Amino acid sequence: DQLVKAEIFKRDGTKETWAYTYDALGRRIGKGRLKTNQEVSETSFPHDLSGNDLENHTRFVWDGSHLLQEIHPDGRYTYIYTDQDSYEPLAQVRNRTDREGESKQEINYFHCDQIGIPREMTDKDGNLLWFGNYYGWGKLKGETNVTGTAYQPFRLQNQYADRETGL
């Protein structure tokens, strides 16, 4: 059983509908927020990975069972792990295009505890970008995005946190 649709009711009374797609191995390969008043169909959505009929579409690229990349409308995040046999993240390479149309690349580093949970994220110069505290089973207790630009989606090893649904 896989999550193919999530309806999120906001405090202001509005509703967002997110749809998810998976490959034959059960790995999530896409997620996107539907434009207002569209319906999700398991057979028709969202096979068009070019972003048609979607707002905020994300694609996922895998190397075996390792999440290799997330491709967002505003750029791409590539993940590097400590070892090919480990799910402990080491670094994140962010490629994006700035407002002037120039390509930019940032490298950020994960600082994990003894069981591979990211506790901090720093930039290439060692400046703190993000830090988090967790409950016993990997649920995020609290986080601080120091710069407001850090993106850290990992929890326990090989667990991806979907911010839209909280899963």
Region locations from a protein language model:
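Short, hydrophobic/aromatic-rich segments at coil-to-beta transitions
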Residues: G64-Q69, E88, Q152-R155
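Short, surface-exposed beta-strand/loop "edge" segments at domain boundaries and coil↔beta transitions
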Residues: E39-V40, G75-Y79, D98-E102
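Acidic/polar residues at beta-strand termini and the immediately following turn/coil
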Residues: D23, E70-H72, D83, D123, ...
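A motif-centric feature for acidic-aromatic and gly/ser/thr-rich catalytic loops and repeats
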Residues: G51, Q92, R99-L167
